[in-house]
Amino acid sequence: DRQDPIADIVYTFEGGTNNVVFSWTGPNLNGVNAVIPSGTNSLVISGTPSVNITATTQYPYQVITDGSACSPEIVYTGVIEVKPEELLVLASAPATENQTICAGTGTNTLEPIIYNLEQEAISAVVSFTPALPGIGYTLTSSQVIISGVAQAAAQASTTIRTFLYEVETTGCGPARESGTITILPTPVMSLYAGDENQPSVCNNSPIEPIDYIFNPQSGATFSITWDQ
């Protein structure tokens, strides 16, 4: 992982040499250096990779003794392999990342939320806060798919409930993406005051007021129709 330090690689030199030379034999690995600590006969390769890569990349190097009393010089070679930071990319429509839906199989159900696994990501997990009954996820070789039908247990009777989901890859990085799924309550309306079935009234005379209350949190509006 290019964000994690490598384990130190230490070479010691002795005998007929008092120095070694380090070099990259391929591309330089930024963030990783080789030094000989003062007063020692050791070469230490250490650091944290800092490179812009989208696939696993190998960085070969060599260490050669220098100025030895006898030849030939000794050559050691090695490779440091760096994996890219994994990436999650929303593949479904932008509007799917945060949705407001209803419970049950009626209208306004969840449209699948799909993230592509990129830059060598091969797995991910999805968590819901709080738990969201009826909604889960599936994992393919290249995608994470959040889908399902919100159960009635996810729905409050009169208030809106919001659930946070987070997608996290399991490898380098890791990559994280999040969004919300909001569950509307079911529509509720009840008679508050007055008589639904009014007694006969004379023309041009007022009726007794009839009051209904409903829950606007469900997103419902009202309309009046007259039965002829």
Ranges and model annotations:
Residues 85-95, 186-195:
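Proline-enriched interdomain boundary motifs that mark the N-terminal boundary
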Residues 21-43, 125-145, 221-228:
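Low-complexity "stalk/linker" and mucin-like segments enriched in Ser/Thr/Pro/Ala/Gly
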Residues 4-12, 106-115, 205-214:
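A short beta-strand segment in extracellular, disulfide-stabilized domains
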Residues 14-19, 29, 117-123, 215-221:
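Short proline/glycine-enriched turn/loop motifs at strand-loop junctions of beta-rich domains
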Residues 44-54, 145-157:
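Extracellular/luminal low-complexity segments enriched in Ser/Thr/Pro
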Residues 1, 95-103, 195-202:
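Short beta-strand segments of immunoglobulin-like
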